[in-house]
Structures are given as C-alpha cells and as structure tokens.
Amino acid sequence: MVDVQTQRKQIEKLISLNRVTKVVKGGRRFSFAAFMVVGDGEGHVGWGFGKANDASDAIKKSLTSARKNLRFVSIRKGTLPHEVIGCFKKAKVLIKPATHGTGVIAGGPVRAVMEALGVHDILSKSLGSNNSMNVVKATFKAFDLVLNAEKVAEMRGKTLKTLWG
C-alpha cells in the first residue's frame, strides 16, 4: 500500500488474528482481534491492535492504529548500529547487528518487525515469554535504546568529525 501523504510504500505484516468469544445470556458472541506491524522499509515502523466483529474490520483498525504509532529507528548498513536488549513484562528480546549477507535470523514476531523496518541482516533471540504482543513490545523497547552516531557524539560532548576521526 502507498501512503498518500508521504508517497512511501508501506510494508504491512499481520502478526496475529484471533477469534475471541464472549459468552452472553443468549449464547456466544464472536469477535476478532488483529495485531499488525507497519513499516516503510527505511527505518520507520509501528505496531497496532484492533478489535471488531468482522476480521477485515479488525485488520483495518489495527492498520490505522499502527500508522499512528510509527517511529524512527536508526539503521546503519542494513542492520542496527549496536546490540540491544529490550524487555516488556516477562518477554525479553536480544538483538545483535550482523554482517552483510547474514539475513534476518529471528523468530516469528521479531522477524515481521525487522522486515517492516527494512533491516536485512540481524541476529535475534526471543527469551522468556513467547506471547507475540509482548515480544513485539519488547522489540520496540529495544528500539528505544538504539543510539545513532549523533546521539553518541552529543552525549560525549564531541562533534561527529572528532568522533569518527
């Protein structure tokens, strides 16, 4: 899908689509819950969750939620600049940069996030909980810890030129 405002192609990945049941006096009422990841393949990625009585409506709601939740992650040469560990509840995600040609070595939800983000080479390990929503949230917590060269130079009180030599 092409985003009309920025003319960027968006990558949409469905993480999970669950049929949930509510038991009422007259019987069971079914609805759907969708969890999606959206990215542009150039460093912007977001997740969204939507619930509706129809599966397609739940997916649409999760897409709009994901587009509102887009954030930028610094990518360098098709991978992250350094190793990070993200934790959310009991889910822990370890993400390591990899050399060119390694590919995306990651489990289900983390793989979908990395593909939507535009990362081509990464090593990842999901530890603890395997709940897909918590694993994705732990991945996004890890993205909050990623530092780019400008942030490192600013923290050290140096310019980029003196930092890189």
UniProtKB/Swiss-Prot annotation:
Residues of the S5 DRBM domain: 10-73
SUPFAM superfamilies given in the database record: dsRNA-binding domain-like, Ribosomal protein S5 domain 2-like
GO BP of this protein: translation
Keyword RNA-binding: yes
Keywords attached to this entry: Ribonucleoprotein, Ribosomal protein, RNA-binding, rRNA-binding
MF terms (GO), sorted A to Z: rRNA binding; structural constituent of ribosome
Residue spans crossing the bilayer: none
Domain of life: Bacteria
GO cellular component: small ribosomal subunit
Role played: With S4 and S12 plays an important role in translational accuracy. Located at the back of the 30S subunit body where it stabilizes the conformation of the head with respect to the body.
Similarity remark: Belongs to the universal ribosomal protein uS5 family.
Subunit structure, interactors included: Part of the 30S ribosomal subunit. Contacts proteins S4 and S8.
Domain commentary: The N-terminal domain interacts with the head of the 30S subunit; the C-terminal domain interacts with the body and contacts protein S4. The interaction surface between S4 and S5 is involved in control of translational fidelity.
The protein's name in its UniProt record: Small ribosomal subunit protein uS5
Species, as recorded: Borreliella afzelii (strain PKo)
